[in-house]
Each structure stands twice: as C-alpha cells, then as structure tokens.
C-alpha cells in the first residue's frame, strides 16, 4: 500500500467472533436493544439484563403462564434486534409444548437410561425430570492412562484435570479441597511443569481420582423451596478454619407449612497460606470469606431476607469483632474493619464445631463421616426457641494486641542542666563515627516524616552531627541558653 494513497475505511456489519472487543460489544448491544422496550416489556427487559450469561438465558418463574409470557417477550425483543433465541429447556411439559420440539434443546447424554432428561446449564447439568442439578465429569481430551493409574501424571496434567471440574457454587467443595491441597503440595515441592508428581502427592492424587465417581452422584434441587417467596426467609452464613484450609457456606432458612427448612446456596473453600499462620488468624480470614460470601449472595438474589446470621465456632474471633479493632495489630484490625463495614455486631453468633457445616470444607473428606455441607445443620430446621447451642464465653482478647512502646526522650537531670539520654549515649560509645550513626538511626525513628530507607546517607550523618553539637552546647552553656530563651541579658565576663 502506498503511503500517499487515500485511506480506506471498513465498517463491520456484524460482530466478529473472536475479536477482543466482541464480548463487550455483544453485551452492550444486547442490553441497549432491550432498554428500548423497557416501558412495554419491563419483566422481559429485566430478565435480559440480569439473567443473561453471554448468549445463554437462565431464568425461573413462579408459574408456567408467567414463564411463557416473559419468554415470548424476550424472544420478540431479541428478534427485533436481529438475535434469535432458541433451544429452550424447562422442567415444565406445558412450556416445552408451547415452544415446540424444534425450539427445544437437543438432549445431552449423561446417563444411558435417562439421557433425554438431562440438559447442560453453564457447565452443570439439569435433570428436567427431577428438577435437580448434577455433574458429569468427562475428560475426553486427557490421556486415559492417567485415569487408569497406569501412569503418574505431571504437574501440568494434574492442573489440567483439576481445572476441568467446573463447580461455581461450591457444591463439590469437599472434593475440590483435596485437589487444591494437592496442587499446593506440588508447588511446595517445586516440581517442574512436565515432571511427574512424587511422594505423598501420588497417593493424594489417586485418592482424589477415586472420589470423583462419588461426586458424579451428587444431586441438588434447582429450586430452594416452592414457598420461598411467600414466607419470611433468613440467610445463615457459617465459617470455619483449620491448619490446612478455611471455608464459608451459606443457606436459606425458609418457613413453610410443614415447618422450617434449610436450602444450600453456595460455598467456598480456600487453602491456608503456605506461610505459617495461627489458627485464630485463619478463623478470622474465614470470617472475612463469610462476609464476602454474604455480599455475593445478597447481590445475586432478588430475595430480601428478613435477617442475616453469621456463625463462627471461634470465640476469639467473635471477641475481636465485638471489641475495639483499633487496638489490635494491622492484620487483625484491617480484617475486622472489613467485616464491620458489611455486617452488624448483633449478626454474629457462636456455634459449636459439631454443628458447623463449614467444618466439612476445611478438612480432607472421609468416607466414614456424614456430611452436612449440602443440607446444613440440623438446628436450622428447628424453631429458634429450641436451639441449644451452649454458651459462648468470651475468647482471648489479649491475642494480637498492638505492642505498646514507651520512648523516653529529653529527660533532664535534677538541676535541668544535662540531657540524661544524650549523656548515656556519650558514655556508651567511644567512637565518634559509631555515635553519629546511632544518633542518626534514633532521629529517623523519632521523625515519622522522614521516608524510611534501609541505609543511612550523608544527609542523615550531617543531621546527627548537628544534633550532637546542639546537645553539647546545651550542656556546656545551659544557663546562657536559658537566659537567651527568656530574654535576659548575659554577663560579659561569661
């Protein structure tokens, strides 16, 4: 192309798949097109903006009639913008009949006997017959010899398999924790990307592989409760920590005609930092995780709970939260500040470890114990008057207190003529150079305006010399200095 030629302008008529700007452009156009129908189709517009995930629409309704009405409006809005929404799937036969077989999504094989009843929803699978979410863990692109345990995988292959398990709500938290701790151990060993794992990591890897077959059997109801919108609802967040991990998990507590019911919302597990930390600090980090989980749940739901309860089995953490956080060290103080910005003091309660479901997200899974991670603690299904959780004595509030430093400066002798601190420095150091360096370091610590450096420079030493000279003059000419400061005359013979 000749630089002197006139520039030619090209305009794209459609969004190009794969361009860096494509996701943002697609979302903007989708929302902008929907907003033009805000007055005529308010429910449909709200669904398009809030319930669209790229090109997938995931929504739920309280009745079949409202579902058909809103979806028809959504289809109409997209059609006027040049988009075609199709491949619907629902647990309602009436809904599927209205939209016809040609618009219903093709079945995805999950189980040989019930393959036609399973549909993929954002990485998970929905069984339309039982209205439950499940998992199908397929690793078709990964060498089969890894799963047959005939070959030890490399670090890269382990990471690839672990990241293939998509669990956005933490349903498989007890299983994913094994994988997270395995990856942490591999990193600590400094294993190369293409080097086979070794030692105890092999045993833990095989244990995790075998547990995946149990994970595929997990099912969780899509709907929290049929009467969730008609009765008062409560949000309960539990948090816990151990030496190896910390976790948070949330549940709805719903009152129905048959009594109280708890429904799993989501959970989160994280490995403890490789740098050693105390259990109270990890428990505090779990409380921060629970606070962030609370915010995520409230922002992601249209339901406004009647009350929110935060539960921890650490009496020390509860004591920190309910005391003045400014007296604690920065690590504790900053995290308590984040907790109190999003929660109230009265929201926090103590729960025994045996009744804390978050405990199951902090320890390696054991096939012999019954888990309450998905169903919640038993006491949530009882009336609050029957809760017998024991007493929560105040924990140790002396931990993590800021150290109190007392700096004694400018202490004078009884006659006021000698600075005691300076005199001790003169008597302690016989080397002038060493004395100057000590004075420079002390002055830097006292003056917070000075930018902290890891070394002394010439300016610091010169300032130290002036300080020493002033103090020597103050000792040798104390009376004259006092007279000048008070405006008195000095005798000529002095």
Across the structure, where does each feature detected by a protein language model lie?
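Active-site palm subdomain of RNA-directed nucleic acid polymerases
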Residues: 23-69, 73, 292-310
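C-terminal reverse transcriptase regions that engage the nucleic-acid substrate
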Residues: 11, 48, 78, 114-229, ...
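RNase H catalytic domain
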Residues: 51, 92, 289-353, 357, ...
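Reverse-transcriptase-like RNA-dependent polymerase core
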Residues: 1-10, 25-39, 127-144, 150-152, ...
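Catalytic palm subdomain of template-directed nucleic-acid polymerases
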Residues: 46-81, 93-102, 316-329
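Flexible, low-complexity interdomain linkers flanking nucleic-acid-processing modules
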Residues: 99-163, 340-356, 360-494
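Acidic, metal-ligating active-site segments
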Residues: 233, 237-263
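A short, polar/acidic, helix/strand-boundary loop motif
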Residues: 6-29, 158, 254-285, 323
């Amino acid at each position: 192309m000749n630089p002197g030629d006139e520039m030619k302008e090209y305009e794209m008529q459609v969004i190009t798949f794969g361009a860096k700007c494509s996701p943002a452009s697609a979302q903007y156009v989708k929302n902008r097109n929907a907003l033009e129908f805000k007055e005529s189709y308010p429910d449909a517009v709200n669904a398009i903006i809030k319930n669209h995930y790229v090109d997938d629409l995931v929504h739920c309704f309280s009745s079949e009639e409202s579902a058909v009405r809103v979806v028809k409006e959504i289809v109409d809005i997209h059609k006027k913008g040049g988009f075609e929404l199709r491949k619907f799937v629902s647990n309602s036969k009436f809904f599927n009949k209205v939209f016809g077989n040609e618009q219903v999504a093709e079945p995805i094989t999950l189980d040989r006997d019930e393959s036609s009843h399973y549909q993929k929803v954002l990485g998970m699978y929905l069984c339309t017959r039982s209205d439950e979410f499940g998992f199908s863990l397929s690793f078709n692109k990964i060498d089969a010899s890894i799963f047959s345990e005939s070959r030890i995988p490399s670090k890269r292959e382990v990471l690839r398999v672990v990241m293939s398990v998509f669990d956005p709500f933490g349903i498989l938290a007890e299983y994913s924790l094994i994988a997270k701790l395995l990856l942490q151990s591999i990193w600590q060993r400094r294993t190369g990307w293409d080097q086979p794992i070794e030692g105890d990591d092999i045993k833990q890897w095989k244990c995790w592989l075998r547990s995946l077959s149990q994970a595929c059997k997990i099912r969780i109801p899509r709907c929290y409760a049929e009467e969730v919108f008609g009765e008062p609802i409560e949000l309960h967040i539990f948090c816990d920590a151990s030496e190896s991990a910390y976790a948070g998990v949330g549940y709805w507590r719903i009152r129905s005609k048959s009594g109280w019911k708890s429904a799993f919302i989501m959970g989160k597990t994280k490995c403890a930092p490789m740098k050693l930390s105390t259990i109270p600090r990890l428990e505090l980090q779990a409380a921060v995780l629970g606070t962030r989980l609370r915010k995520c749940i409230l922002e992601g739901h249209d339901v406004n709970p009647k009350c929110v309860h935060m539960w921890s089995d650490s009496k020390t953490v509860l004591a920190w939260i309910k005391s003045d956080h400014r007296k604690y060290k920065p690590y504790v103080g900053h995290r308590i500040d984040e907790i109190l910005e999003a929660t109230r003091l009265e929201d926090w309660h103590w729960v025994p470890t045996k009744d804390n479901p978050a405990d199951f997200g902090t320890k390696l899974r054991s096939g012999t114990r019954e888990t309450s991670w998905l169903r919640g603690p038993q006491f949530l299904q009882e009336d609050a008057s029957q809760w017998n959780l024991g007493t929560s004595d105040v924990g140790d509030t002396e931990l993590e207190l800021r150290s109190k430093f007392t700096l004694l400066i400018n202490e004078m002798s009884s006659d006021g003529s000698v600075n005691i601190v300076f005199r001790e420095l003169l008597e302690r150091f016989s080397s002038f150079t060493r004395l100057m360096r000590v004075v420079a370091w002390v002055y830097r610590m006292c003056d917070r305006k000075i930018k902290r450096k890891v070394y002394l420079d010439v300016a610091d030493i010169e300032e130290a010399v002036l300080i020493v000279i002033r103090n020597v003059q103050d000792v040798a000419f104390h009376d004259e200095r006092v007279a000048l400061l008070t405006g008195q005359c000095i005798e000529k013979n002095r």
